[in-house]
């Protein structure tokens, strides 16, 4: 993947950069692997905003991705590398020898014409999926399951990769991209390699309108609001926030306060993320 930088023909173009999309080989998605995606605009089933700053954006179809990789022992050929508007990574269209087609997250280095396979007896090769127990130590992996048979939920964003550090008993020790070290069961599946589209983090949107195309609405500072709307609001001119620690819109401590609460998996974390 390359990045194109425009000449500064306007204020928006001056700081804009876009992907060259040179790895994309197919423009239209596979008809049997898409479904309509209704816009939620950050609302729940009661119509109330649960995620702020969402709304608008270009219409999308959802691409059905195979995160489970549960078609064991059947080889598949990579037919195309495609763009997916619903994620930062590219996706690869696989055609299995039995005629079925599926999408997977495209790892770095996977090309059209390559053959991939999943299962405990698959080779240690980019794009192949195996249980953690069958993967050698030190291997870079992505699309990792947390629960056996649930499908990959970890390390799916563009350019990310985890590393298999150790195996002890029924569990493998994995170092995550965030620096967190955690234990995952050896029967959980993972895919070999690093997620592709590694230059995604270097793309600059350049203008507010491009954020709106992605469905991201403006984020207003608390200090620019009224006191009734935010703890930082009010005052004459640019007033200090008037409290020792910054607060959220709802008066809870912000910045650096842990919000994670998942007791089921907390006990498997060996070292917290950096």
Curated annotation (Swiss-Prot):
Ranges of biased composition (kind: Basic and acidic residues): 227-239
GO biological process annotation, one example: cytoplasmic translation
GO MF term set: rRNA binding; structural constituent of ribosome; transferase activity
Gene Ontology CC terms: large ribosomal subunit
Domain of life of the source: Bacteria
SUPFAM superfamilies assigned to the protein according to its UniProt record, in alphabetical order: Nucleic acid-binding proteins (SSF50249), Translation proteins SH3-like domain (SSF50104)
Record-annotated membrane-spanning stretches: none
Keywords attached to this entry: Ribonucleoprotein, Ribosomal protein, RNA-binding, rRNA-binding
Biased composition (Basic residues): 249-259
Region (Disordered) location: 220-259
InterPro entries xref list: NA-bd_OB-fold, Rib_uL2_dom2, Ribosomal_uL2, Ribosomal_uL2_bac/org-type, Ribosomal_uL2_C, Ribosomal_uL2_CS, Ribosomal_uL2_dom3, Ribosomal_uL2_RNA-bd_dom
Role this protein plays: One of the primary rRNA binding proteins. Required for association of the 30S and 50S subunits to form the 70S ribosome, for tRNA binding and peptide bond formation. It has been suggested to have peptidyltransferase activity; this is somewhat controversial. Makes several contacts with the 16S rRNA in the 70S ribosome.
Quaternary structure and partners: Part of the 50S ribosomal subunit. Forms a bridge to the 30S subunit in the 70S ribosome.
Family: Belongs to the universal ribosomal protein uL2 family.
Protein name, as recorded: Large ribosomal subunit protein uL2
């Amino acid at each position: 993947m390359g990045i194109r930088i425009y000449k500064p023909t306007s204020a928006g173009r001056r700081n804009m950069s876009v992907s060259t999309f040179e790895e994309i080989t197919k423009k239209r998605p596979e008809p049997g692997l898409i479904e309509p995606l209704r816009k939620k605009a950050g609302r729940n089933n009661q119509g109330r905003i649960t995620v702020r700053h969402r709304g608008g954006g270009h219409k999308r179809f959802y691409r059905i991705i195979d995160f489970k990789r549960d078609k064991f022992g059947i080889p598949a050929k990579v037919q195309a590398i495609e763009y997916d508007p619903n994620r930062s990574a590219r996706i690869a269209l696989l055609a299995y020898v039995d005629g079925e087609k599926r999408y997977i997250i495209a790892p770095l280095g996977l090309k059209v014409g390559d053959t991939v396979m999943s299962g405990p007896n698959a080779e240690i090769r980019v794009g192949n999926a195996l249980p953690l127990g069958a993967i050698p130590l030190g291997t870079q992996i992505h699309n990792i399951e947390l629960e056996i048979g649930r499908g990959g939920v970890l390390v799916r964003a563009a350019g990310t990769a985890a590393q298999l550090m150790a195996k002890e008993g029924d569990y493998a020790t994995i170092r995550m991209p965030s620096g967190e070290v955690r234990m995952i069961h050896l029967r959980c599946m993972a895919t070999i390699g690093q997620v592709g589209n590694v230059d995604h983090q270097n793309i600059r949107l350049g203008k507010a309108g491009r954020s709106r195309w992605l469905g991201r609405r403006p984020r207003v500072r608390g200090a620019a609001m009224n006191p009734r709307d935010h703890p930082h609001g009010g005052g004459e001119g640019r007033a200090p926030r008037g409290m020792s620690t910054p607060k959220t819109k709802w008066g809870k401590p912000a910045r650096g306060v842990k919000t994670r609460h998942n007791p089921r998996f907390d006990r498997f974390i060996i070292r917290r993320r950096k």
